[in-house]
């Protein structure tokens, strides 16, 4: 059962890697879109394996939007909040982290005395050889959020029939989140 939908198909549009991970974990019948995250797609197993050999004591924390070959090398796979929690709870002092680089600051803040190294990116689309930088995530900040909330012209108008149909999956996501605590 996935999201309370027994025997239902579900489409995952954001990341084929995340969808593949969910499919392998749950056995759910998922329709996977060909999309991916530009950061997570750039992590490569062979490059991560080289870094693991340099730091055999390291625990590897991987976001599930990464390719399956990278996930296979992980000690922990999880959302950013799950990776932060794992870093706090695991009895290791050295971590290799395969997700957007911004998470490293939060990890260092919440677990002083532990070392965090960004997993290297290696693909053609990488913004640099060893950084997992998402330019779009950096566009969102508190000042811009406040500006949008204060602005009078930022309303989005949706046709009522579309709103009614769109409310169903949103209500399911909220209900699922409430069930999970």
Stretches with model-predicted labels:
Residues 39, 64, 82, 91-92, ...:
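C-terminal functional extensions of proteins
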Residues 75-91:
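Donor nucleotide-activated moiety binding/catalytic core segment of transferases
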Residues 42, 49-60:
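Glycine- and Gly-Pro-enriched alpha-helical subdomains that act as flexible
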Residues 13, 38-44, 96-98:
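Active-site glycine- and acidic-residue-rich loops that bind
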Residues 1-7, 11-12:
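Single conserved hydrophobic/aromatic residue that forms the stacking wall/gate
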Residues 19-20, 48, 70, 84, ...:
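Short, well-ordered alpha-helical microsegments
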Residues 8-9, 56-59, 90-95:
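Short active-site oxyanion
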Residues 35-36, 62-80:
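Glycine-rich phosphate-binding "P-loop"
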């Amino acid at each position: 059962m996935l999201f309370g939908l027994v025997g239902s198909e579900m489409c995952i549009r954001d990341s084929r890697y995340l969808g593949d991970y969910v499919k392998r974990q749950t056995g759910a019948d998922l329709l996977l879109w060909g999309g991916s995250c530009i950061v997570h797609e750039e992590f490569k197993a062979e490059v991560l394996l080289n870094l693991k050999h340099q730091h055999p004591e390291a625990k590897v924390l991987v976001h599930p939007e990464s390719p399956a070959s990278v996930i296979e090398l992980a000690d922990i796979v999880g959302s950013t909040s799950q990776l932060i929690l794992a870093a706090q709870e695991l009895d290791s002092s050295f971590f290799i982290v395969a997700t957007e680089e911004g998470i490293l600051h939060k990890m260092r803040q919440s677990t002083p005395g532990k070392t965090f190294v960004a997993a290297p990116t290696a693909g053609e689309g990488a913004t640099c050889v060893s950084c997992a930088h998402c330019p779009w995530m950096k566009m969102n900040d508190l000042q811009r959020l406040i500006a949008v909330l204060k602005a009078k012209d930022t309303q989005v108008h949706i046709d009522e029939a579309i709103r009614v149909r769109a409310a169903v999956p949103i209500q399911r996501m909220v209900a699922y989140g409430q069930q999970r605590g």
